A protein has these predicted regions:
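Active-site beta-strand/loop microenvironment that shapes enzyme catalytic pockets
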Residues: 61-96
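Short secondary-structure junctions
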Residues: 60-66, 152-157
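Active-site microenvironments that recognize anionic phosphate/pyrophosphate groups
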Residues: 1-54, 77, 89-235
Length: 235
């Protein structure tokens, strides 16, 4: 049974309907001080296109939260039930480094002086950032990226993680195209094994290690190698 469907959740689980089609749930296994899961009221597959507008609206209305999307084979814990996540804003290293990253962006497409799509040249994973001043413009720019990405084998959408937050009067949406679910080190043997299956939080620079031994032996070089292995090549 699907653990995000209301009929299968514990009676103690508090919930609130938001945007008329999601339930706001406190994540029972949080990885950040504030961590919500927002499943759709209806059981339906994890797909970004029907949710991107809602994701941007939630980010715009809740500047203290960062919205996350994990594709079906990109860290999603429930790929058969559509959901977003929301966490405390400003905690991910991606966000904390934004002022620096912002100074080395490669233009991909612009709609005016301030809105458009840029490639993040200084980030270790393949990443595109959408800068927009409205949900509608952000959604339109996202769809142009979506259409340009290669479809994944046996899946109905390109592999990706998406991170969105409000930055003053603009919306920032970081799209991280993927080519692989997990790095080879996930199934490696002995000291070569790292049980890291990256989702949006990990791709945003905060690596979650279920095992203490992985935490202790993790290095920047290993993290960079994982990013490069699972990311679509920047080209």
């Amino acid at each position: 049974p699907c653990f995000l469907c209301a009929k299968n959740r514990p009676a103690e689980q508090m919930h609130r309907v938001v945007e008329s089609r999601y339930e706001l749930l406190v994540n029972p296994f949080p990885i950040l001080p504030v961590h919500f899961t927002l499943p759709t009221l209806k059981h339906q597959p994890q797909r970004i296109l029907p949710m991107i507008g809602d994701m941007l609206r939630l980010a715009q209305r809740n500047s203290d939260l960062t919205l996350l999307y994990n594709g079906p084979h990109c860290g999603a814990s429930a790929p058969d039930h559509a959901h977003l996540q929301a966490v405390s804003s400003g905690i991910l290293p991606l966000q904390r480094s934004w002022q620096r990253l912002n100074h080395n962006l490669t233009e991909v497409a612009k709609t005016d002086d301030e809105e458009g799509i840029w490639q993040m040249a200084d980030y270790p994973a393949a990443a595109l950032v959408i800068r927009s001043h409205s949900v509608e413009h952000g959604e339109r720019l996202f769809k142009s990226i979506y259409r340009a990405l290669p479809p994944a084998e046996d899946q109905t959408e390109p592999m990706m993680n998406v991170i969105a937050w409000s930055n003053g009067d603009e919306l920032l949406t970081v799209v991280m195209p993927r080519k692989k679910h997990r790095p080879d080190c996930y199934t490696a043997q002995g000291d070569a094994q790292f049980m890291i299956s990256p989702g949006a939080v990990d791709m945003g620079g905060l690596i979650i290690t279920p095992r203490e031994e992985d935490f202790r032996k993790l290095t920047p070089d290993v993290v960079t190698a994982i990013y490069r292995e699972v990311s679509l090549t920047p080209e």
